[in-house]
């Protein structure tokens, strides 16, 4: 048979297609670069504040005239961000190089390697090919993903070599659409190495043959980060509002502070919602445990944060800071700077002053004057606080009042309220939030800063806020402010405000017709048509009405869960409402969304106010066992049932009767073949130990009763006949021969043995 070769015409056609594809990629990259420049110019223009306030915005051509300020060049250097840098163009990869790196990216994503050894050899070849082309690959639209995957797989030596390759070009890289993601990934993956080197746990990797050790490899990771900061320092004012550079600054600030890198709050701060999640097989092995916990950082990092905050306050006046507070890109960075200042420096200084004994009054006055003379970010935002809050015409009061109703500025206000010193918070509460707390809680934007205020209120101030909010409960319900109601209940529970909890529950029930049974159907929207999570369209294509409905459902379910967790009347009300639901409504809760199904899981875990509560809840689900097992949300409810004991260890403790568990497993056994076809079904079958039920039923019964109290479990588990007889024999007195024993019936050796025992007795 002849070989299957391509004809000359096919080869020419393939070559033309490859050239056409390469040209298309080049045009796309050029178009993206031009688009990026236009966006940056518009971005700089959007940052321009009021021109008569002494602040001169940077021009669109990237230059900055320091003499444009009334005070001359000195004021220009102080008030203007330095944007006088020329963005570098690192060139483009050749067609063959681009095709090679794109193919390598596809192979790494698919992870289709015969063995790990071949995969390691492949990676070594990719690293060799990458040498000298790091900047081109990082700024390439089609190959930057490969760079991110390689960073995830890199060891410490390779990360340091990337710092060396990027060095001197970081300002162009962090402001580039694609290269900025590579820089962020490099920063975040290198952060744990600093702690390892600091503690002495780091071990140097062996150098491959034929490779020379560079100066960057000999340097510590701490020095490499500090060199990067030195390079970005003069452009800090510009990077605060740059679309891509601001993310890199936030990542560096989080790394310098030693905060956990894998927390949900940290990830949402560093990445936008549209950020593509890039991973690769084997990255988890390189992931350090330090990423998920607070890391020890050197003192130079703390000093670097202080310098960044000081430079930020020096390069902008109060007006520029207020404009930055309402800037969509600059606000998150300003939030992080303010939070770090309040948590690392202001509160730390207060503790030192409390613990340190003052020798005399003169030294105390000198220290007070020094602290007052220090310019802080908090002092620039709310000068002369807390005394200034008493007068609405002061700069501090105007700033807070202007931020309360602003959708972007209110987020900065939340950070300020959460972390500010107690004296400033008391001033905010007494003069701004306290007198009008009920109206602020009604507003869809101002309610979020007001909720942060509720979280810090004392017992007496919280009782006063509840008293003012009770008449507004019907308005809260109509406007869907369930997060406000939940916060009021939770804070009263933490502050042991039983009377306030009962008053809030009464007001909430009256808003729903004074009937506890209506609470769950209304809050969980069981009477409305809610689209299941599996059938929901992409968030980009959802209508605003659908988004609002999902938002209200989420907050309503959180309120139900909070009430269920509060013992007493709130828990009793929710359990009564759940017990009164129709089986179809319970099934809808179990299968519609994660929010509603989690309520059923928590209800099964909560001690019952009515002894039959758990039994009633499970009986509503019994006719739909197969539907639950194949549902993403319902399977969690089904798995929770088997984890509960069959008999309560104490009165009102969570328990599901054993005959109900047997009913469920027997129904699952009827659908065994169907369950094995789906991942969810296999998970439920494995959790309920269906194979044990089919082949060793007495072992399954014993396993199912392991969660029961010790006394009930021993009495109920079926045992073998020999075990029962042995246990009964141990309970009988020594020499006992049974109540029906007749010595006359004994014959032979047994009779002689009995007569001998009688004679000895």
UniProtKB/Swiss-Prot annotation:
Where composition is biased (Basic residues), the residues are 1-10
Q: Which Pfam families match?
A: PUF_NOP9
Chain segments carrying region Disordered: 1-56, 350-372, 712-739
Q: Where are the Pumilio repeats?
A: 129-164, 165-200, 231-271, 395-430, 432-467, 620-666
- SMART domains named in the record: Pumilio
Q: Where in the cell is it found?
A: Nucleus, Nucleolus
In its UniProt record, which GO terms are filed under biological process?
endonucleolytic cleavage in 5'-ETS of tricistronic rRNA transcript (SSU-rRNA, 5.8S rRNA, LSU-rRNA); endonucleolytic cleavage in ITS1 to separate SSU-rRNA from 5.8S rRNA and LSU-rRNA from tricistronic rRNA transcript (SSU-rRNA, 5.8S rRNA, LSU-rRNA); endonucleolytic cleavage to generate mature 5'-end of SSU-rRNA from (SSU-rRNA, 5.8S rRNA, LSU-rRNA); ribosomal small subunit export from nucleus
Major location category of this protein: nucleus
Q: Which UniProt keywords apply?
A: Nucleus, Repeat, Ribosome biogenesis, rRNA processing
Superkingdom of origin organism: Eukaryota
A single Gene Ontology MF term assigned here is: RNA binding
Q: Write down the InterPro entries for this protein, in alphabetical order.
A: ARM-like, ARM-type_fold, NOP9, Pumilio_RNA-bd_rpt
A GO CC term? preribosome, small subunit precursor
Give the Basic and acidic residues compositional bias ranges.
Answer: 11-44, 350-371, 719-733
Protein family per UniProt = Belongs to the NOP9 family.
> What's the stated role of this polypeptide?
RNA-binding nucleolar protein required for pre-rRNA processing. Involved in production of 18S rRNA and assembly of small ribosomal subunit.
What's this protein's name?
Nucleolar protein 9
Q: Which gene encodes it?
A: NOP9
């Amino acid at each position: 048979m002849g070989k299957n070769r391509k004809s000359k015409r096919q080869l020419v056609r393939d070559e033309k297609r490859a050239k056409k594809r390469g040209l298309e990629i080049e045009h796309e990259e050029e178009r993206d670069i031009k688009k990026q420049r236009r966006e940056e110019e518009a971005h700089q223009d959007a940052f321009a504040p009021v021109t008569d306030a002494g602040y001169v915005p940077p021009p669109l051509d990237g230059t900055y005239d320091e003499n444009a300020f009334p005070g001359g060049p000195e004021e220009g250097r102080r008030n203007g961000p330095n944007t006088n840098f020329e963005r570098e163009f690192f060139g483009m990869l050749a067609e063959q190089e681009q095709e090679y790196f794109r193919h390598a990216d596809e192979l790494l994503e698919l992870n289709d390697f015969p063995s790990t050894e071949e995969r390691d050899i492949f990676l070594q070849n990719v690293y060799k090919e990458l040498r000298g082309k790091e900047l081109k690959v990082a700024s390439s639209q089609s190959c930057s993903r490969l760079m991110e995957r390689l960073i995830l797989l890199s060891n410490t030596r390779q990360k340091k070599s990337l710092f060396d390759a990027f060095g001197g070009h970081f300002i162009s890289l962090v402001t580039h659409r694609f290269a900025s993601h590579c820089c962020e990934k490099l920063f975040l993956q290198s952060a744990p190495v600093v702690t390892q080197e600091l503690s002495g746990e780091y071990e140097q990797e062996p150098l491959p043959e034929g490779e020379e050790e560079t100066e960057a490899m000999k340097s510590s990771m701490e020095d490499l980060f500090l060199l990067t900061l030195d390079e970005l320092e003069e452009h800090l004012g510009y990077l605060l509002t740059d679309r891509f550079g601001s993310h890199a600054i936030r990542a560096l600030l989080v790394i310098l502070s030693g905060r956990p890198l894998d927390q949900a709050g940290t990830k949402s701060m560093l990445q936008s919602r549209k950020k593509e999640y890039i991973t690769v097989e084997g990255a988890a092995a390189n992931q350090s445990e330090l990423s998920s916990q607070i890391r020890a950082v050197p003192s130079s990092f703390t000093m670097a944060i202080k310098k960044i905050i000081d430079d930020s306050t020096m390069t902008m006046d109060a007006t520029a800071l207020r404009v930055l507070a309402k800037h969509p890109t600059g606000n998150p960075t300003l939030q992080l700077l303010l939070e770090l200042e309040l948590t690392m420096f202001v509160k730390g200084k207060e503790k030192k002053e409390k613990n340190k004994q003052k020798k005399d009054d003169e030294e105390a006055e000198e220290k007070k004057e020094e602290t007052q003379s220090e310019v802080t970010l908090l002092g620039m935002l709310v000068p002369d606080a807390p005394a200034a809050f008493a007068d609405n015409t002061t700069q501090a009061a105007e700033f807070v009042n202007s931020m309360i109703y602003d959708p972007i500025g209110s987020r900065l206000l939340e950070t300020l309220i959460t972390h500010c010193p107690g004296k400033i918070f008391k001033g905010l509460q007494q003069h701004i939030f306290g007198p009008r707390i009920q109206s602020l809680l009604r507003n869809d934007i101002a309610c979020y800063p007001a909720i942060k205020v509720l979280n810090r209120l004392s017992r007496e101030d919280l009782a006063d806020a509840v008293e003012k909010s009770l008449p507004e409960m019907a308005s809260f319900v109509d406007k869907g402010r369930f997060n406000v109601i939940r916060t009021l209940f939770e804070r009263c529970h933490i502050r042991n405000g039983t009377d306030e909890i009962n008053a809030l529950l009464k007001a909430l029930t009256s808003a729903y017709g004074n009937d506890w049974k209506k609470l769950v159907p209304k809050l969980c929207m069981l009477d409305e048509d809610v689209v299941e999570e599996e059938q929901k369209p992409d968030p980009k294509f959802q209508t605003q009405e659908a988004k609002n409905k999902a938002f209200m459902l989420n907050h309503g379910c959180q309120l139900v869960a909070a009430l269920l967790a509060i013992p007493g009347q709130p828990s009793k009300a929710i359990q009564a409402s759940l017990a009164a639901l129709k089986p179809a409504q319970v099934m809808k809760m179990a299968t519609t969304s994660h929010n509603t199904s989690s309520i059923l899981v928590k209800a099964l875990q909560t001690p019952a106010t009515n002894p039959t509560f758990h039994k009633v809840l499970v009986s509503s689900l019994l006719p739909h066992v197969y539907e639950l097992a194949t549902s993403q949300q319902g399977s969690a409810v089904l798995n929770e049932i088997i984890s509960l004991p069959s008999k309560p260890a104490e009165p009102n403790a969570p328990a599901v009767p054993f005959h109900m568990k047997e009913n469920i497993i027997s129904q699952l056994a009827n659908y065994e073949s169907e369950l094995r076809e789906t991942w969810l079904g296999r998970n439920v079958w494995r959790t309920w130990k269906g194979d044990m039920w089919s082949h060793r039923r007495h072992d399954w019964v014993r396993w199912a009763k392991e969660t029961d109290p010790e006394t009930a479990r021993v009495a109920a588990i079926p045992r073998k006949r020999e075990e029962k007889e042995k246990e009964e024999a141990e309970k009988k007195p020594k020499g006992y021969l049974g109540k029906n024993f007749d010595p006359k019936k004994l014959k032979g050796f047994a009779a002689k043995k009995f007569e001998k025992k009688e004679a000895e007795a």
